[in-house]
Amino acid sequence: MESIKNRTSIRKYAEKEVSEELLNRLLEEAERTPTMGNLQLYSVVVTRSEEGKKALAPAHFNQPMVTEAPVVLTICADYRRTTLWAENRKGTPGYDNILSFMNAATDALLFTQTFTNLAEEAGLGTCFLGTTVYMPKMIIDTLKLPKLVMPVATLTIGWPAEHPALSDRLPLRSIIHHEHFEDYTPEKIDDFYAEKEALEENKEFVRINNVET
């Protein structure tokens, strides 16, 4: 997929709506993503209203794309639905430990990535907001998330109004281990991060923050 090879975060969007039909098609296609035990331990809250986006913005450090994007998706680890299903069938769900959350978070993040790939292949731009897990309580309150539902990812979505350069990536040799894990030596670290440290924006970051590296 060329959209994956050329993938970059889009933070500026054209003043053009993302149709309900297109969004629902992409969400439905993303449901085909792998899921633990076929339980689909995730839910998605779709925010389109200006009021809703403005309410979410403080939880994302008021980054402009939250209010400027036509659509904001909050993807949640959700084992409430499965728990209630089990309880309503007189079963014991057993979703009361850290493994439960890890399973649900994994499902949610797999769904997020699949949706991102599909959306970008359809010509949309997206931005993954890592701020979701910084202040989850604010998001929980804003979206009225009940017990056993936890926000783990946020995507802003719209038609791109910018085409930024690709972000740098570490060389393949830095992430692949053959047969067993090979621990990192100082020499390997120097090798892996040499290109990143040579980038002008990273040199500027070092200068501004008055640090050695």
Give the ranges of each region predicted by the language model.
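Acidic, surface-exposed loops and disordered segments
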Residues: 1-213
